[in-house]
């Protein structure tokens, strides 16, 4: 489960954004 409305196959520990990529599992900045 990734952040955002839509799941992403390539999730990275970067900043979570809703509405536009990247959708990440763990929000840690931008």
Swiss-Prot record:
Q: Which GO MF terms are attached to this record?
A: acetylcholine receptor inhibitor activity; ion channel regulator activity; toxin activity
Glycine amide PTM positions: 30
Q: What is known of its domains?
A: The cysteine framework is IV (CC-C-C-C-C).
Q: Its family? A: Belongs to the conotoxin A superfamily.
Q: Which residues are reported to carry the modification 4-hydroxyproline? A: 7, 13, 21-22, 27
Question: Describe its PTM?
Answer: Contains 3 disulfide bonds. They are not added, since framework IV presents two different connectivities (I-V, II-III, IV-VI and I-III, II-V, IV-VI).
Give the function comment from the record.
Alpha-conotoxins act on postsynaptic membranes, they bind to the nicotinic acetylcholine receptors (nAChR) and thus inhibit them. This toxin binds with high affinity to both fetal (alpha-1/beta-1/epsilon/delta subunits) and adult (alpha-1/beta-1/gamma/delta subunits) mammalian muscle nicotinic acetylcholine receptors (nAChR).
Compartment(s)? Secreted
What tissue specificity is annotated for this entry?
Answer: Expressed by the venom duct.
This one is known as Alpha-conotoxin EIVB
Q: Which InterPro entries match?
A: Toxin_14
Highest taxon of the lineage: Eukaryota
Q: What is its main location?
A: secreted
